[in-house]
Amino acid sequence: MSNPSLSSKLLGGNLVLRIAIGLVLGACLALVNPDWAKNVGVLGQFFVKSLRAIAPILVFVLVLSAIANKEVGSDSKLKPILVMYVLGTFVAALTAVVLSFMFPTTLELVSNPDNLNPPQGIGEIIKTVVFNLVDNPLQALANANFIGILAWAIGLGIALRHAAPSTKTFLNDFAEAVSFVVKVVIAFAPIGVFGLVAETIATNGADAFVGYARLLGVLLGAMVIVAFVLNPLIVFWKIRRNPYPLTLTCLRESGVTAFFTRSSAANIPVNMNLAKRLGVRDEIASVAIPLGATINMAGAAITVTVLTLAAAYTQGIQPDFATALLLSIVASVCACGASGVAGGSLLLIPLACSLFNIPNDIAAQVIGVGFIIGVIQDSAETALNSSTDVLFTAAVSQAEDQKA
């Protein structure tokens, strides 16, 4: 009998439980000995710095590989499903914007620099985006210019779609290697959360968690509205009958499993089995379900939008609605890069924050806040993402059957 490898020991186990334990231990240490709690804050700072280091290369490699490996000439029957995926993700981001405007949230961060230069409306933001698009790719990676990174990744990905199979295999293997490094970093999340929570409570008091509770309320509120109101409306638009039997079936049989696995990729077999029982043809489900696990990211769009606007409010920035609408579009695009990576949506926050000229160190601290609330946030996000995959696929299948 072989012993488990070090990597399997490190990456295995229940991450949610370990993060929860780290959160509780950090809070207890801060209440018992605030001085020690401030000292262990270096663990959280190290974790956040690790996230900042991996985020640029992660976005570049995942987007490049995903576009380069996309099959040319996709089945036209998938187009209605893709439309629903894109529409659902954008509607989710827009819902997050509306709730964030209704319930603006500020966060307790370690630092609050006074030298911010917030953009003066949508015109300045568009100008910044255009100039960042043409940044030198190496400089974009070094400076974490995520807009430039995204532009180069998309451009190179399109150019490499007709590359040799060996090139595509290399890109896919490289993406998996980067994802493995990310998993190793994420495996230390319990220690990082322990340090972040301990330092936050010791420095700011337990009241800091009031802001986190409000933030979590906005996040979960947006997800509930999307899952029980907006997704059914989109399904009704497609099948023209009561959408709730199908919606509740998908939430119960796919969402619950995804909530505990916290992985859309791991939930693909569950969705495939459910799609088959719902009458979806295998040739459609075998493509649409894995594709949904990659690009259908309503929960991730909500997370990116809410946390980015919370970062803006924390820095005293008051976004106008036009800017927030642009954020919805950016969040929808960014969310597609969050698939298959633990905490992936959190790592894309710096990209969205760059729209408001929020420094990367502040964005990284917001990522840390995301990990503190991630015990619930990431589970709920995955449940929404994965259940929506099979929901929209089944809805399109039923609509096609009605036409036949």
Curated annotation (Swiss-Prot):
Pfam families: SDF. It is found in: Cell inner membrane. The chain crosses the membrane at residues 12-32, 53-73, 81-101, 140-160, 177-197, 216-236, 287-307, 329-349, 356-376. The keyword Cell inner membrane applies. It catalyses: L-serine(in) + Na(+)(in) = L-serine(out) + Na(+)(out); L-threonine(in) + Na(+)(in) = L-threonine(out) + Na(+)(out). GO terms for cellular component: plasma membrane. Disulfide bonds: none annotated. Gene3D superfamilies: Sodium:dicarboxylate symporter. Its main location: membrane. The keyword rRNA-binding does not apply. GO terms for molecular function: neutral L-amino acid:sodium symporter activity. GO terms for biological process: serine transport; threonine transport. Keywords: Amino-acid transport, Cell inner membrane, Cell membrane, Membrane, Symport, Transmembrane, Transmembrane helix, Transport. It is a multi-pass membrane protein. HAMAP family: Ser_Thr_transp_SstT (MF_01582). Involved in the import of serine and threonine into the cell, with the concomitant import of sodium (symport system). Belongs to the dicarboxylate/amino acid:cation symporter (DAACS) (TC 2.A.23) family. NCBIfam families: PRK13628.1. This is Serine/threonine transporter SstT. The lineage of its organism: Bacteria, Pseudomonadati, Pseudomonadota, Gammaproteobacteria, Pasteurellales. The gene is sstT.
